[in-house]
């Protein structure tokens, strides 16, 4: 089914190269290499799919442009995340901050966000502007919440859900709702598309956190348990702490890697923890499906 969107996704990538082009050739090359490195393009696909709720053909140019904007937001936020996390690789590729330094990477991220603001100003729809402003604000708050929550054993499930809402779900919701708005979809379909994107985004992030323990390093392009190594307490770790609090007695900023690996092994080999994580993800996926049914 998704094969039919391959050509449209390619059009989005080509559009990104056009609107991000600058007088600085190094910047152009870096951006082209970064966007060409692959990726699932989940947000682009979801925007394109939801744009079918209205008149896609008569709004194709604006839909492609909004898909470009969404992908640029996602990419810029990843670049800034990598700087904050001091990450050296992302999905098997070297990060910009590792290759070129924090200053250059920060400027690339800022440049991309400036492109977003320039391009979205061409859209007259006030709801697009409102949704975008809220999305960017929530992305920043989500990053602050994650930073404050590192190694925090007082983190509750509710705290985790609030964090992933801001870090992941809110941008996916913006992708789905902007696709439906720009295509001229009916109000009830616009509202449904936002709920669909939000719940799907929650499910998506929980699955990603599940795969951080259950997936393989080769398939994910990163080491197993990397979030926990970085002090980030995700849902599988929260469930593990509820089941075995003693395991986390030494979990603080001074804990060594060996002790972290003990926790990681406990989680990845505990079927109950992984199954409960999947179950919670499925609940959000069910809500996403029900949003469409409505």
Task: Give the positions of each predicted feature.
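All-alpha prenyltransferase/terpene-synthase fold signal
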Residues: 1-294
């Amino acid at each position: 089914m998704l094969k039919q969107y391959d050509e449209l996704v390619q059009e989005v990538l080509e559009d990104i190269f056009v609107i991000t082009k600058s007088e600085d050739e190094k910047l152009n090359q870096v951006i082209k290499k970064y966007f060409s490195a692959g990726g699932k393009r989940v947000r682009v696909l979801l925007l394109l799919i939801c744009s079918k709720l209205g008149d896609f053909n008569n709004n194709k140019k604006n839909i492609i442009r909004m898909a470009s904007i969404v992908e640029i937001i996602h990419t810029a936020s990843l670049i800034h995340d990598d700087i904050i996390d001091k990450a050296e690789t992302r999905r098997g590729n070297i990060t910009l901050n590792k290759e070129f330094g924090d200053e250059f990477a920060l400027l690339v991220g800022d440049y991309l966000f400036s492109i977003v603001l320039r391009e979205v100003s061409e859209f007259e729809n006030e709801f697009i502007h409102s949704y975008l402003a809220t999305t960017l604000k929530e992305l920043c708050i989500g990053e602050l919440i994650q930073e404050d929550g590192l190694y925090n054993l007082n983190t509750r499930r509710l705290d985790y859900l609030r964090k992933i809402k801001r870090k992941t779900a809110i941008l996916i919701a913006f992708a789905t709702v902007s696709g439906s708005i720009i295509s001229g979809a009916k109000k009830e379909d616009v509202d449904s598309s936002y709920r669909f994107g939000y719940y799907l985004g929650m499910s998506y992030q929980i699955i990603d956190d599940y795969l951080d323990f259950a997936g393989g390093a080769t398939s994910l392009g990163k080491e197993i348990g990397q979030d926990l190594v970085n002090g980030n307490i995700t849902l599988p770790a929260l469930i593990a702490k509820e089941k075995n609090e003693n395991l986390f007695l030494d979990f603080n900023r001074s804990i060594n890697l060996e002790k972290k690996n003990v926790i990681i092994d406990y989680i990845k080999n505990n079927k109950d923890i992984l199954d409960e994580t999947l179950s919670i993800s499925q609940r959000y996926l069910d809500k996403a499906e029900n949003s469409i049914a409505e």
